[in-house]
């Protein structure tokens, strides 16, 4: 009898973990800013982050088709540096570039992977716009908004529990350069690291898209995530919308896992942000 109940318990546990790690949630945020050109009212941005080689076998693509975004932004860690599988990432990329223009910045796993050059080549084949340390304008009906991207600071090959001063200086240096002569009033930043919101808010940035935190990996109802890289226990920025000063930030819980192999009360997530102006 004890063996029977043990088997039932283990089976139920595995079923629960499989559900928690594969049932993709769609989180929608409405973002309003009077600096946004009227032409961008209702502009829909789909945010993908932290795939870490995970395969969803078409289910993710079907959800994205139904969302029907105007653009797709990816904030890093498409691959996992410990078990890199570029093909898994490119299977998703090949599908989503047919849905909407796709913009990408690197995460720490790309920057620390010996396969990153190959990944960039593959992304380029599918016309994914690499936004690492780059600025561009998105045009809609003659109006424009700015899109800025920064490479993950692990480009300095320095991965520690907390970002080093050199890495923070790198981010500040790149943002100083990229925001120096902006031609757009409303500007979006793509950056893998949410813990640097206090840095981003010092620049002419209205909305940030970020990932990296994996939702805190295990979430406790009413308390939130338990642990995130570079933020430690009970991270402040593990999911959802945050605001400091005039800068708002959308943090994705991500889609895959890295060192820790499963999520609890923290399903994989697609984030949708719908823009609107005050008028």
Predicted regions and their residues:
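Short, flexible loop segments at the rims of nucleotide/cofactor-binding pockets, characterized by
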Residues: 48-54, 79-83, 162-167, 186-187, ...
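Short, surface-exposed loop/helix-turn segments at secondary-structure junctions
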Residues: 221-235
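Structural motif
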Residues: 45-47, 71-73, 103, 147-149, ...
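Conserved catalytic scaffold of divalent metal-dependent phosphoesterases
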Residues: 35-36, 117-207, 238-241, 245-278
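N-terminal membrane-anchoring alpha-helices
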Residues: 1-40
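Membrane-embedded segments
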Residues: 41-137
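Short, charged, surface-exposed secondary-structure boundary motifs
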Residues: 82, 140-142, 158-159, 217-224
């Amino acid at each position: 009898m004890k063996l029977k109940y043990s088997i039932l318990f283990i089976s139920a546990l595995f079923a629960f973990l499989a559900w928690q790690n594969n049932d993709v949630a769609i989180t929608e945020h409405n973002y309003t800013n009077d600096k946004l050109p009227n032409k961008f009212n209702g502009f829909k941005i789909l945010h993908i982050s932290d795939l870490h080689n995970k395969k969803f076998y078409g289910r993710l693509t079907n959800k994205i088709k139904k969302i029907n975004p105007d653009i797709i932004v990816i904030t890093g860690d498409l691959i996992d540096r410990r078990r890199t599988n570029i093909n898994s990432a490119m299977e998703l990329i090949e599908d989503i570039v047919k849905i909407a223009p796709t913009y990408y910045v690197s995460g720490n796993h790309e920057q620390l992977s010996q396969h990153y050059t190959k990944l960039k080549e593959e992304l380029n084949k599918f016309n994914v716009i690499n936004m690492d340390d780059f600025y561009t304008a998105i045009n809609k009906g003659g109006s424009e908004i700015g899109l800025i991207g920064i490479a993950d600071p692990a480009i300095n090959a320095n991965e520690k529990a907390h970002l080093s001063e050199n890495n923070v200086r790198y981010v500040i240096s790149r943002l100083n350069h990229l925001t120096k002569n902006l031609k757009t009033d409303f500007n979006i930043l793509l950056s893998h690291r949410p813990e640097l919101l206090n840095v981003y808010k010092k620049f002419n940035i209205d909305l940030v898209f970020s990932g990296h935190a994996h939702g805190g990996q295990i979430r406790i109802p009413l308390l939130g995530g338990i642990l995130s890289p570079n933020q430690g226990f009970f991270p402040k920025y593990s999911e959802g919308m945050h605001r400091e000063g005039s800068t708002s930030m959308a943090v994705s819980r991500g889609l895959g896992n890295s060192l820790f192999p499963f999520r609890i009360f923290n399903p994989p997530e697609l984030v949708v942000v719908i823009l609107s102006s005050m008028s």
